[in-house]
A protein has these predicted regions:
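Transmembrane beta-strands of outer-membrane beta-barrel pores
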Residues: 48-54, 94-100, 123, 137-143, ...
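Membrane-embedded beta-strand positions of outer-membrane beta-barrel proteins
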Residues: 44-46, 80, 92, 119, ...
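Repeated loop/turn-to-beta-strand initiation elements of outer-membrane beta-barrel proteins
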Residues: 54, 87-92, 126-131, 173-176, ...
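Outer-membrane pore/translocation modules
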Residues: 105-207, 252, 267
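Residues that define the transmembrane beta-barrel architecture of outer-membrane proteins
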Residues: 40, 72-76, 109-115, 129, ...
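Outer-membrane beta-barrel biogenesis signature
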Residues: 26-61, 68, 302-309
Length: 309
């Protein structure tokens, strides 16, 4: 006989990492790749993402929850990448997210989540080998509820991220990329005067959300109008507690996940399309989600090129 359990959820440490885009010629890019827009060129992308799970890890115990059935998170995200120089790019994005379940009576949540901005700088580029320093931050743009999990669309914390990225690209188009990041996260305020975390009872509406870190490796091919890659990612919190037995999750939980995925893009000219699929293969305090995304990209010049004398 199957046991009915309280709800749980999985929220990605960086929701919009699932939504990515590239453009050929001067390829559009993300904060986790070595691709840059050229000076005075930009790329606007709009991506739809669908992520769902019906099993999750309560700490390290993999289980299901018949009270919510299948949990689904969907999002639409516009993103703009702008080339300031050939070695410096600015990226900005804000996703609109909605959550729902196939069972139970929990009210689904929807709204704009967090506005994110990134600076990406290439400080070394020699014989196909390059090093990149990347800094980013995010801030909530709406007053969504952070502790109504698994239905919350985010954690309501401000973040600051530092990342180092290494890339090697062969003249054949084959490339390898690896990066590591550390994510600082602010405290949040919840609409209650007391809560339980770390096996303690806190008489406060201020919650300390643990910092996080991530790492990834990618192997792909990029040449002319075609890009394809396979990747593996790992993300975790730097501390935090666990989902208590038969209890709801909370923003203080130490969420960990190992994800594998594939990505493909086709862009013969300035308009292109891309698609991505990813699956969480292992984790703790997260859902075993499968995610798909598809996007359309438009590359344009936002200023006239300098005239040659």
């Amino acid at each position: 006989m199957k046991k009915y359990l309280p709800l749980t959820r999985w929220t990605s440490l960086a929701c919009w990492f699932l939504l990515t885009f590239h453009v050929s010629q001067v390829f559009a890019q993300m904060p986790n790749d070595a691709i840059y827009m050229s000076k005075k060129t930009a790329c606007l992308a709009v991506t739809y993402s669908h992520s769902s799970w019906d099993k999750y890890w309560e700490n390290s115990l993999r289980r299901e929850n018949l009270n919510i059935g299948t949990h689904t998170t969907q999002s639409v995200m516009p993103m703009l990448a702008v080339g300031i120089t050939k070695n410096l790019n600015v990226i900005a994005a804000v996703p609109y997210i909605w959550t729902q379940t196939s069972a139970g009576n929990l009210m689904w949540q929807k709204g704009f989540q967090d506005a994110s901005g990134w600076l990406k700088y290439r400080f070394l580029n020699v014989s196909g080998f390059s090093l990149h320093a990347i800094a980013g931050g995010s801030i909530p743009v709406t007053n969504y509820i952070p502790d109504f999990l698994p239905m919350s669309i985010g954690l309501q914390c401000k973040t600051a991220t530092a990342r180092l990225l290494i890339n090697y690209r062969h003249k054949s188009g084959v490339y390898m990329t690896a990066h590591g990041s550390y994510i600082f996260r602010s405290n949040i305020k919840i609409d209650r005067d007391t809560y339980q975390a770390d096996e303690k009872l806190y008489d406060s509406d201020q919650v300390r959300v643990p910092n996080a870190y991530d790492a990834a490796a990618r192997l792909g091919y990029l040449k002319k109008a075609i890009q394809a890659e396979a990747y593996a990612e790992y993300g975790a919190c730097a501390g935090g507690d666990f989902i208590r037995r038969n209890d709801m999750p909370f923003p203080t939980n130490n969420m960990k996940s190992t994800t594998v995925g594939v990505y493909a893009k086709y862009q013969p000219k300035n308009i292109g399309v891309n698609a991505r699929a990813a699956h969480v293969v292992n984790g703790a305090n997260v859902g075993q989600s499968t995610a798909f995304s598809a996007g359309i990209l438009y590359q344009f010049r936002y200023a006239r090129a300098d005239k040659k004398l």
